[in-house]
Amino acid sequence: MFDKYDVIVVGAGHAGCEAAAAAANMGSKVLLATMNMNTIAQMSCNPAMGGIAKGQIVREIDAMGGYSGIVSDKSMIQFRMLNKSKGPAMWSPRTQNDRMRFAEEWRLMLEQNKNVDFWQEMITGIVVKDGRACGIRTGMGIEIEGKSVVLTNGTFLNGLIHIGEKKFGGGRAGERAAKGITEQLEGLGFESGRMKTGTPPRLDGRTINYDKTEEQEGDGDIRGFSYKNIELPATQRPCHITFTNQAVHDVLKTGFDRSPMFNGRIRGSGPRYCPSIEDKIERFSDRDRHQLFIEPEGWNTVEIYINGFSSSLPEDVQYKALRLIPGFENVKMFRPGYAIEYDYFPPTQLELSLETKLVKGLFFAGQINGTTGYEEAASQGMIAGINAHNLVKEEEPFVMKRSEGYIGVLVDDLINKGTKEPYRMFTSRAEFRLLLRQDNADIRLTEIAHKMGLASDERHQTLLAKKESMESIQQFIRNLSVTPDEINGFLGNIESAPLKQKVKLDKILARPKVGIENLSEVIPVLKDFVSTYSEQWIESAEVEMKYEGYIQKEREVVEKMNRLENIKLRDDLDFDKLSSLSAEAVEKLKQIRPKTLGQASRISGVSPSDVSILMVAMGR
């Protein structure tokens, strides 16, 4: 009935879909197992992709040949580039998406891949023989053989949904929890924990008075995540902004005694940076209002996602409070918000390839590793899919460095530091933000992915054309001289110091408030030259030139870090015998077993003096 698969992926959320796509596109025969074929790639929470640091991750997935960027672009209903008022290291693309079309596009792309098969059933266990994963066991008792297994169970492992004093098993509203896998893994020696996340109520957009809210349009310059030429929408749907008030807070407080968060019924750790509305009121009691975003769920639906109002309070309290919000006086609720508790496995139990240390051929990706967010999950899925394929084909694991991508930062943080609360990516977590911009993910990663057989020849050719174009633009600007007569009027308008003699144009470009776009308006020859190039390629060329000195400094730091990465630690190194190491360092080093001195230096509890001791032990 079943072939023997190279890779079996359990769970078809964002992590599972990217894992299946990556392994299949590299040539593995893949089975994607899900409890419900109709919920493949479902956006369980907000109908949006990207955002601060997350947008960079989606672009990195796309640069590697993953599908999240393409699907996001095809299902986009609004685009915004966040943080444009800050430097380019902080610019982060974000899309509002049609929830239904997003899932449809993902399923269509997977179904068009001849290397992907599907099976709909609850998976209750992994078949493990001689310390190696070699298949899965279904609820009907069927065993399906596989050379590797990727677990991407999301919030389904012993999921428990809370609404006020009510609680019931489920992995998502209206769907069953997954039973059996946690218990088996614990029996194999894995440590597990509990985490919690939440979602807001869904509202009927026909009952909202938008005149009492603030409209938030998308950017006029619509862009996408994908480096491929995806057709983008000609129009956009606006979001809206409203605020809570003291009356709303007072009503919400009446339900605190029935809140599972406050009465101790929820044991799992919740996301620090995405608190529920009741948590915000409790923690920030000095605030008399909190901002809410009214987000449409798609082109052809009236359903509204109310971002910022996540709650597990009783449904009657949620409803009463909503009706006190400006614009919501007559609002109807489609379903209440809820909190969900689920099992996760501390990610320090993984290798940097996302393969488990205890069971060969078993990989974890997504919320099972303690992360939160579609983008974080999708990126882990891609890494796990790549490495499951590499394991089966007896190739070296792929490990993205911290200096190569936000995905590298994410995985490195998880494995070396672990997490006791849902981990979310921020730009502040990356030490090389100027190197890891959203505009250059293809320059950083597409060549690597092409060599692995993941990024297509078409992507590679586009990358080569972009690099050549950027070099041409930069060379033209470096060679072009401008006189005081040509440029001083422009400089005066932007309150920049006038020229006293002729200079090369790159010296002017380095100044604040100066860009290729506004320079083109006063230098016709520049305007003619750049008119033949892509706007985004021009922007990348400009950023590289304007921030050249800072970028070079970051590259020098990366070089120093890479020297530590190149010092391998012996697999048989006995940390107990290094008596000068601190007790905490010995404990952490034994737990994580770092492969390199660089990795050891980033482990929480390992000090610079401990690193020096390791260097001596390695004969350096």
Task: Label each PLM-derived region with a short phrase.
Residues 127-143:
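Conserved beta-strand-loop-beta-strand element in the redox core of flavoprotein oxidoreductases
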Residues 4, 21-125, 140, 152-172, ...:
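Conserved N-terminal/central alpha/beta ligand/cofactor-binding core
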Residues 377-398:
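Internal hydrophobic alpha-helix adjacent to the cofactor/substrate pocket in enzyme cavities
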Residues 429, 435, 446-612, 616-620:
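Extended, charge-enriched "interface" segments that sit outside catalytic cores
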Residues 10, 143-154:
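Short hydrophobic core segments
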Residues 305-371, 399-412, 534-588, 593:
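A glycine-rich dinucleotide-binding beta-alpha-beta segment and adjacent secondary-structure elements
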Residues 36, 54, 182-319, 327, ...:
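An anion/pyrophosphate-binding glycine-rich loop and adjacent beta-alpha core
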Residues 2-15:
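Beta1/beta-strand and adjacent pyrophosphate-binding region of the FAD-binding site
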